Amino acid sequence: MSPDQLVVEFDRALRTILAPARSMRPLPGAALPDAELPAAQRSHVAGLMRVNHCGEICAQALYQGQALTSRDPTIRDALRSAADEETEHLAWTERRISELGGRKSFLNPLWYLGSLSLGLVAGALGDKWSLGFLAETERQVEAHLNGHLRSLPEDDSRSRAIVDQMRLDEIQHAETAVRYGAAELPSPAKVAMKVMAKVMTGVAYRF
């Protein structure tokens, strides 16, 4: 990697972790009325959205690592395009956390570094395995978001609109990875990913 590329990637990391994210698409549910939630429910929803925001931090780092090690320019461009959509998810979840009076995870820098490392390793294994890891990640995120939709209050239409649009985007990302030749990961790898995700979501919900 050239010094210029190193600066660009470092700037990308800093902006992801520290700078307010921006979205080219409208915020889902922005025109809907905000629900009058009891304090306990607001805290719960803020925790769920913090987990989702943390997940998008991880997605940015994962895509960055995979793009850096991809051998195929077409796949690299697809990863960058998906990362742009994940940036929109960052903006949406950040906005909703603020509306709920919540805060982002204190551990975002650690989540970012860990996910960047995973992305670099996945990419180094070759594009088909890197894409397989990406596809499985997105499938597990979809399942996670389905769980959040079941957990969110029925009248919290704003949060539900954000989570549902994120879910649709993640489905599309998984389908894109498969279209570009993603390999099916072995079952032990899928189980390990689920365990790691469960630890991350549990910690991010609280911290």
Curated annotation (Swiss-Prot):
Instruction: Recite the UniProt keywords alphabetically.
Output: Cell membrane, Iron, Membrane, Metal-binding, Monooxygenase, Oxidoreductase, Ubiquinone biosynthesis
A GO molecular function annotation here is: metal ion binding
Q: Where does the UniProt annotation locate this protein?
A: Cell membrane
Q: Does the keyword Iron apply?
A: yes
Q: Which InterPro entries match?
A: COQ7_proteobact (IPR047809), Ferritin-like (IPR012347), Ferritin-like_SF (IPR009078), Ubq_synth_Coq7 (IPR011566)
Q: Does the keyword Metal-binding apply?
A: yes
* A Pfam family annotated for this UniProt entry: COQ7
Q: How does it sit in the membrane?
A: Peripheral membrane protein
Q: Which residues bind Fe cation 2?
A: E86, E138, E170, H173
Q: Which GO terms describe its cellular component?
A: plasma membrane
Task: Name the family.
Answer: Belongs to the COQ7 family.
HAMAP family listed in its UniProt record: COQ7 (MF_01658)
Briefly, what is this protein's role? Catalyzes the hydroxylation of 2-nonaprenyl-3-methyl-6-methoxy-1,4-benzoquinol during ubiquinone biosynthesis.
Can you name this protein? 3-demethoxyubiquinol 3-hydroxylase
Species of origin reads Dechloromonas aromatica (strain RCB)
Taxonomic lineage of this organism? Bacteria, Pseudomonadati, Pseudomonadota, Betaproteobacteria, Rhodocyclales
Q: Which gene encodes it?
A: coq7
